[in-house]
Amino acid sequence: MNKESPNIRIIDIAEMAGVSVGTVDRVIHNRGRVSEENEKKVRAILEKANYQPNLMARSLASKKQYHFLATNPSFKPGEYWEAISEGIDKAASETELYNVNVTKLFFDQYDNHTFDAIVRTLFDEEDIDGVLIATLFTDSVVRLSRELDARDIPYVYVDSNIVGEHQLAYFGTESYDAGFIAAKLLMSQLGSHSDILISRIVHSGKNDSNQGKNRKEGFCQYLTEQGFEGNIHEVELRIDDTDYNFARLDEIFRANPRIEGAVIFNSTCYILGNYLKERGLENVKLVGYDLIGKNTQL
């Protein structure tokens, strides 16, 4: 029946069970008194029909306004966070008719202080029904999560997960596993004595990206398990500063000619990729993340 009647109504269930509509309503919502016999009949039909309450219709009828907040890193066209922002916009558009309003709060993904600043204004909003949190900065996100817990406001995480908090859901990949697989992929192309370059984008404040930290942990764990005997070199690069980046990378590669592999744990793989291409370092294998335009064009 569940395939034939996906939109079964309460009145249909009442007719099949031989009870009143009010009895079905009380069983579905666990309210009021219902005889054991009638409850069994109704629940049997609910299970057989795979009945799910029509939450959208209920929302339309209730007149209640729902207000959700979404913390969203600022981005340039084609960057990783653009797709997530567009997804939020799409969800907001599709649920607007059901009394749902979504407000986006933007911050600099390379500066945890800007995230803390929007958090300070977040609770100026009235009647918050839920928050979507971009989990770039672990310490800041944990503080926000615990404040939301104290206020009994539900929240979900996007991008990377943080274990031990009370998020309703997490949307993203397993960061640690992604780093582990990246190392496995890179080492399949290198010898155990090859040197590896790990690049990171400089962040303002004291926090690196939670996603990047987890990926790096998984990456290094694989190397340890495989008995990696080469050296790991690390370099800090700047977003949108090609001259600085090329100068730093020139220094690294001149001083460490045995570097044969490189990895960056966020969506800015194109920075290293463009350098390697420009310098003709075709022997260096590069691993990165996220199918944004600048990366796929390499």
Stretches found by the model and what they are:
Residues 94-98, 151, 223-230, 277-284:
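Short helix-capping segments at alpha-helix termini
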Residues 137-177, 292-297:
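Flexible loop/hinge segments that line or gate small-molecule binding clefts
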Residues 73-82, 103-115, 172-178, 200-220, ...:
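Hinge/beta->alpha junction and helix N-cap segments in small-molecule ligand-binding domains
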Residues 53-117:
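Amphipathic helical "hinge" segments at domain boundaries
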